[in-house]
């Protein structure tokens, strides 16, 4: 993942990847088929880590949205729970720059795993948040405004993920603290209320 994160798919060679991992070129071919297979395996690892952390709350949220019985207050609570889960995950992984850089590269370069991550992670996540924002606003139908709000809301988390080095430098520390997590959670609640017009 490190080579892809640093050089992108086109810039990373299987020779460099093998040297970095301390394996032979045939080992990559045996386990992954080729460079693209290895690249997709990295994307699956990222998706798996996200699912391990977020699957319970996301699964419950999707079921609540589908039920049609979710109240505005309930939708707001779920939004906050999702944001707090993401804040916790990103702050814990702030030092793992290869994962966030890999994702950033996929977004900017549209590498081979872009469509996979879009289909399995980004699109469903943004649309779920948009649906919850609509319900929390008292609407049954999700609008383009809800989708745009979800995009802007979730993109604010880049300060904790692929931009964490900048954030930590500004905060004058080497890692996020428990106090940072509390403050970020409180701010997330304020952002939700602002998007819902409750601020």
Model-derived features: positions:
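All-alpha amphipathic helical-bundle segments outside canonical DNA-binding/catalytic cores
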Residues: 117-120, 137-154
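Amphipathic alpha-helical segments used for helix-helix packing
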Residues: 93-116, 164-169
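Short alpha-helical scaffolding segments that buttress acidic/His motifs in well-ordered protein cores
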Residues: 86, 100-107, 153-157
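Short, basic, alpha-helical segments at the C-terminal edge of helix-turn-helix-like DNA-binding modules
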Residues: 45-49, 58
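Amphipathic alpha-helical packing segments from all-alpha helical-bundle domains
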Residues: 77, 111-137, 186-190
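Hydrophobic alpha-helical connector segments
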Residues: 55-95, 146-153
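Helix-turn-helix
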Residues: 3-45
